[in-house]
Amino acid sequence: MSNIQFGSQVYTWFMQGTGKGYDNKLDHMIKIAGEAGFTGIEPMVLEISESALGCGKYWLGDFCDAGRLKAALDEHHVKLAGLALVCAFDGDQLTPGEEEAVAFTINLLKQFPGAMLGTVTLPSGRKNDLQRRRLNVARNINEVSKRGTDAGLKCSYHPNSPPASLVRTQEDYDVVLSSLDPKVTGWTPDVGHIIRGGMDVIPTLNKWQHLVNHIHYKDFSGNGPEPWAQMGTGKLDFHQITEWLVSRNYEGWIICEDEAHVAVEDPDGVTRQNGQWCRENLHPIVA
């Protein structure tokens, strides 16, 4: 039996009103994730939540408090799979706001043994100094991961694929992933972002398999400016990807992060459907 667990990412709820719809409602997301059959949840620590969006601190709000967060998790029998720390990370050094967010995230995660410190690059544009900024991302991510590792945490970097993302293409991956320090930084492949960036999923997983310590699942339609599909209805072969994980004795989380258009209007319903789809299609593979 493999040691693979399934969790849910809060971005599915964040899309409604760009954070406004479910601001300070992490307890609700935890409840729905548990009802959907997921055993974990991955909230965000979004540095710009207050300054740019007018939402609660880090899009955690009251759940910045470890006691409040633990109580909500325990009530619904859901684990904290990790926190996704979202910052630009592209400066010559960490900004004061990034430093504050890093320290907060590490201190919170220390209260939840086994939860992953995920780092995510906030898309910041590709027009100026692309190579320097990509290398800055790798250096800053390694610095954050070293601090996390020194605090007893496991750490993993998650690239994404919006047009303004610094790490979205094969060339970007070759620069940044090859510059990660594997002693402290793993890689979270997001299979939807990989295909949107023009890459094939399995060859990309093969190339960087030594770094994989966390993974995100989202489906891809290829249509429109936000080319996502509800899980199981798009172009990705999640059976094959899950078999790839099992064959390599992967231990950790599969985090479902549905960004399909229908999820904007009904994140609860989509999360429940994702949970059912995983139970019917993927749980037998990892059993």
Feature locations, PLM:
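Histidine-acidic metal/acid-base catalytic patches
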Residues: 1-39, 74, 101-103, 113, ...
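Active-site acidic/histidine proton-transfer and metal-coordination neighborhood
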Residues: 31-34, 66-68, 72-82, 87-187, ...
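Glycine-rich, proline-tolerant flexible connector loops at the mouths of alpha/beta enzymes
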Residues: 42-70, 124-125
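Conserved residues at the C-terminal ends of beta-strands
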Residues: 44, 86, 120, 218, ...
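The substrate-binding groove and active-site-proximal loops of carbohydrate-active enzymes
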Residues: 56-60, 87-95, 192, 230
